[in-house]
Amino acid sequence: MAEPSAGRQKVVIVGAGPVGSLAALYAAARGDDVEMYELRGDLRDPNTIPLNFTKSINLALSERGITAMRQANREELIDRVLADAIPMHGRMIHGRSDGKLWEAAQTYDVHGRAINAVDRGTLNNALLDELSRTPNVKMFFNHKLTGADFRTNRAWLERRTPGTASTPESVTEIEITFDYLIGADGAHSASRYHMMKFARVDYQQEYIDALWCEFRIPPSPETGDFQISPNHLHIWPGKEFMFIALPSADKSFTCTLFAPAWHYEKLEKSSPQDLVTSFDYNFPGVCPNLITPEALAEQFTENPHLPLISLKCKPHHFGSSVVIVGDAAHAVLPFYGQGLNAGLEDIPVLFSFMDQYGVYDDSISPTPEARASARAAALQAYTNQRTADTWAINDLSKQNYLEMRWGVKSPVYKLRKMVEETLDHYVPSLGWQTQYSRVSFSNQRYSEVIASVKRQGKLLGVAGLSSVLVSVMIGAGVLMRWPERLSLGAVWRTVFGRN
């Protein structure tokens, strides 16, 4: 990391979630004066309502996110976050056959690495507490970005009084200036909206044909412990539906039902008993075993049924004055557990380009004009690299939805996973890894993950074809040597060892 520069910059960050907070730590460590503005109240207050109006407390934290936080050089931060994390070593697939419930574990990684289920409140609190102890950071809550001029580096915000209706009397408009602004304000980003007035942004937004609703599996009423294994991501797969459960620190599980909109409409018109029947048919063992019928109906009725959005855009910046990160630049579907991790990873990538181009080196950027020029080059380089990677994880997340719904039960999926893990474990010099391991347990660029997996797929295809050809050649040789003694059935049994 570069040493703090003598020429301090003023950095404004919009959004005080994990990505914006981490960006504030990185900028502050380089000597910048940081102001962070958040639409909501202080996220450390349990009464602050999340923007999606749910109280979901689970996040999946893997290698990329952990690395990004470690590189902030705040050891207490990562220790605090991981202290209460629950490691998930694999998936637990649930089903029913011949009237009997079954579950089957699938490890994530042949080397035993795990994804961490972390508490959203713990993560937010840890980051914001670090910022509170940082003298060159100021935090402003209940501030809404309403306008920005990225040519003159000015922005306008409404300061709102908590707990009051938005009226001219309760809202005060303020104007701020900055050297550059980081927009980390989510999928419906105001920063991106205002940046698009200045930059020619290619923008693609997509809602998939699925809604999600949150449920909760409580701790065991008898023991107070987890009702099912806490060290797995639990999946009840179906071709069109999926129910998943992630462990929480209070021994409960936060669950999500993913289903097409038409299925939600059907259930909304159904009776509570029909809801229970639907769950019993599609997700055997959930109700009444883990969630009571009354709780299931109550949670389905009271919790919102929300859409799933993904977006891509390019560029992620304009000039030297603004850059968008996290969901503001690349909201992804939740099916790879990489939304948080990709957003956190944006920050070290961004600041590595800032360092590389001398933004914080006074010998390279001795004046504000020189720093602005270096910053523009750094932001352009960031866009050039990060766009390819964020588009890649966007595509991978969509593909993983299909895998989680029914691919996890596919013999082809299981065979390829077994072959790749065997090569990874016994012949590590080949550098062979499953796609999941590359995404979740490495810092390899997402775009390079796709390229590597394609190469592995081609090699497996060639190897499989070669095996078939060798078998055919052996069979042909046997027929030519003893044509009168062997039938085709005998050859089949000889070559393939089958009856």
UniProtKB/Swiss-Prot annotation:
Its main location: mitochondrion. Keywords: FAD, Flavoprotein, Membrane, Mitochondrion, Mitochondrion outer membrane, Monooxygenase, NADP, Oxidoreductase, Pyridine nucleotide biosynthesis. Its cofactor is FAD. It holds the Pfam family FAD_binding_3. It catalyses: L-kynurenine + NADPH + O2 + H(+) = 3-hydroxy-L-kynurenine + NADP(+) + H2O. Pathway: Cofactor biosynthesis; NAD(+) biosynthesis; quinolinate from L-kynurenine: step 1/3. InterPro entries: FAD-bd (IPR002938), FAD/NAD-bd_sf (IPR036188), Kynurenine_monooxygenase (IPR027545). Its EC number is 1.14.13.9. GO terms for molecular function: FAD binding; kynurenine 3-monooxygenase activity. GO terms for cellular component: mitochondrial outer membrane. PANTHER family: KYNURENINE 3-MONOOXYGENASE (PTHR46028:SF2). Belongs to the aromatic-ring hydroxylase family. KMO subfamily. Catalyzes the hydroxylation of L-kynurenine (L-Kyn) to form 3-hydroxy-L-kynurenine (L-3OHKyn). Required for synthesis of quinolinic acid. This is Kynurenine 3-monooxygenase 3. The lineage of its organism: Eukaryota, Fungi, Dikarya, Ascomycota, Pezizomycotina.
